[in-house]
Regions:
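Copper-binding active sites and cupredoxin-like electron-transfer domains
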Residues: 1-405
Length: 405
């Protein structure tokens, strides 16, 4: 046990985070998937069997990525597969302290007939290639053991393969972190216990106060004395980081730096497995997406033709919540460069909840601007009847890339 500044609401008088001993039992509790509640819930609730596990022991959970329902005659169960995307995995062995010490996770349900290639040095970024299952009459609702994918993978040039880049990002907002052997104090701007603890993404954090050489507990008056103008830049020196642009030594944040080529389809999986009930807003600069990317009666993900709204920020992200963002690297105009992703709460952003989405140039794409597209068009002025989507166009100089539908 280590002492922490992390706090919880005062459930009983004198109750605090540091007065609770961590449980030695752990479990994996999923959402959305179907399973036997008595054996694979990953929790110990009421009169149900305990499906958590003690130190030195193991347990196997069986989950189905979809709905399990009886057939019309009630003679057997049938499975209806669902592409859920990202799902939070919670440790229900100790809902108070385990997430604070890193016991979190996510389950990603990919499209049917998928394979994935992990990026170098990170399992949070992969390239997904998938092809649609064989067109079998009444495929949905068949027996669970029925084979649904083709026997062989289609050729790359067959037009039947689809590909996207996937980035998984886990919120952590109740971390018990130490510096120089001492617990890091809470951010001075926090409002109550829901804001306590340190912040991070994927076991990484990059507090702005640390980049400035300040302390988490410094008063706002003290913080206002620092020069914030280049605090997000990777090309200028920061506290304990000497950037050298000529020799390509950069002061990048410790939080995940996701990469993709301009024009490449990408899916951000943003998950908050467990922590404080303070909700977050996630923003990806320079990009937008449809809030509900569901098609095929909400069984798969894709371009939702009925989704008329496009947003650049997703709110209401609390414990157990997930957001699936389907967009294009570099935005509609497929522009390369570094794009900021961050949480929208100001002091939590300063506490480390931000990072970089690095979009590299794509030699297979060429951007051009039509002659009519002057600056006024970009700000909603008269477009002479030309659709705003034509402000930028991209032409392929080589074979068209494999994309998602």
């Amino acid at each position: 046990e280590t002492w922490s500044y992390n706090m919880v609401p005062p459930i009983v008088p004198g109750f605090s985070f540091n007065q609770v001993r961590s449980s030695s039992r752990v479990g994996l509790h999923p959402q959305l998937v179907d399973y036997n509640l008595l054996k694979s819930d990953g929790a110990h609730v009421g009169l149900n069997d305990d499906s958590t596990v003690a130190p030195g022991a193991s347990i196997t959970y069986l989950w189905y990525a979809g709905d399990i329902v009886p057939n019309k005659k009630g003679t057997r169960i049938v499975g209806i597969p669902h592409e859920f995307g990202a799902i939070a995995l919670e440790d229900m062995g100790d809902v108070i302290k385990h997430a604070s010490h890193g016991a979190i996770g996510a389950l990603v349900i990919e499209p049917q007939c998928s394979r994935w290639d992990e990026g170098a040095g990170s399992k949070a970024q992969v390239e997904i290639t998938y092809w649609k299952p064989e067109a079998v009459l009444s495929r949905h609702g068949k027996h669970l053991k029925r084979k649904i994918c083709p026997a062989a993978e289609p050729n790359l040039d067959s037009g039947k393969l689809y590909r996207f880049k996937e980035m998984v990002l886990l919120y952590q907002d109740n971390l018990s972190v130490q510096q120089y052997g001492q617990p890091v104090p809470n951010l001075r701007n926090g409002d109550d216990s829901e804001d306590s603890g340190q912040k991070g993404f994927n076991y990484r954090t990059e507090p702005l106060w640390a980049r400035l050489g300040a302390s988490a507990a410094d008063e706002p008056e003290t913080m206002s004395q620092f020069d914030w103008s280049n605090v997000l830049s990777s090309t200028v020196p920061h506290f304990r980081c000497e950037a050298d642009f000529v020799n390509k030594k950069y002061c990048d944040p410790e939080t995940p730096i996701f990469t993709a080529k301009a024009g490449e389809p990408v899916r951000f999986r943003v998950v908050h497995p467990g922590g404080h009930p303070r909700q977050h807003g996630f923003t990806l600069f320079g990009h937008d997406w449809v809030p509900s990317p569901w098609v095929d009666a909400s069984k798969t993900m894709g371009w939702n033709q009925d989704g008329l709204t496009r947003v650049g920020s997703a709110g209401g992200i609390g414990p157990g919540r997930d957001v699936n963002i389907l967009t294009t690297a570099g935005g509609d105009c497929k522009v390369s460069g570094d794009y900021l992703y961050r949480t929208q709460e100001g002091f939590m952003f300063g506490g480390g909840l931000w990072g970089i989405f690095r979009v590299d140039e794509n030699p297979g794409l060429r951007w051009y601007q039509p002659a009519w597209a002057w600056a006024g068009n970009l700000f909603g002025y008269e477009t002479n009847g030309v659709a705003s989507a034509d402000v930028c166009k991209v032409q392929a100089l080589n074979n068209a890339p494999v994309v998602q539908p």
